[in-house]
């Protein structure tokens, strides 16, 4: 897997977390789409009249979270000078490291918050034991950002600080293999790829993959 491919995963996780927090804040503050502020990032199902029958069923049966849809058509705003309101600013501020951890006056995102959650079915245990299917469904929460410190930690006698700083993000290394990804992170990446593939298959009316 290349840096570019894994970077897509990291960015997707980052953006999904931000969009979810923006939608939650919009709901908490009563902001709705069209307000020009954080309301433009509200959950799409805020207007129940626009929900299809299946979404209405999910909401009525399982609660809001099963039917919630993020507004991914609205581009995220990264320029602090263009933040639409204080609520948006509050959400974005929480995604960055605190001021006291800023380096050379520049704050960076707290990559420890980039977490991907997924579920999987433990088929081996399910085959050996009796029980309900839900008893064998496992949930994983994985921090997805690669450990870039391996460049310094694993090469004691080399000057690898530039690689630590640039290797994962610089476009010049986009087609190079990703470094610092654990087995757990690799499995999470594969789950995400399957998720994307199934979304594409579903949009075409094709069978999904396991």
Each PLM stretch: what is its role?
Residues 1-210:
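Extended beta-strand/loop cores of jelly-roll/beta-sandwich
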């Amino acid at each position: 897997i290349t840096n570019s491919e894994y970077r897509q995963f990291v960015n997707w996780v980052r953006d999904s977390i931000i969009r979810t927090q923006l939608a939650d804040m919009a709901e908490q503050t009563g902001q709705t789409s069209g307000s020009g502020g954080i309301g433009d990032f509200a959950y799409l199902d805020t207007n129940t009249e626009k929900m299809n029958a299946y979404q209405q069923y999910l909401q009525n049966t399982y609660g809001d979270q099963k039917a919630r849809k993020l507004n991914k058509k609205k581009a995220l705003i990264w320029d602090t000078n263009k933040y639409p309101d204080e609520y948006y600013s509050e959400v974005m501020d929480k995604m960055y490291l605190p001021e006291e951890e800023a380096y050379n006056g520049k704050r960076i995102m707290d990559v420890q918050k980039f977490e991907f959650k997924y579920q999987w079915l433990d088929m081996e245990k399910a085959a050996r034991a009796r029980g309900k299917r839900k008893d064998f469904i496992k949930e994983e929460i994985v921090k997805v950002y690669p450990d870039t410190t391996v460049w310094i930690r694993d090469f004691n006698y080399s000057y690898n600080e530039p690689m630590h700083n640039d290797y994962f993000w610089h476009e010049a290394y986009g087609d190079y293999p990703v470094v610092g990804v654990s087995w757990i992170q690799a499995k999470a990446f594969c789950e995400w790829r399957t998720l994307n593939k199934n979304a594409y298959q579903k949009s075409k009316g094709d069978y999904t993959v396991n």
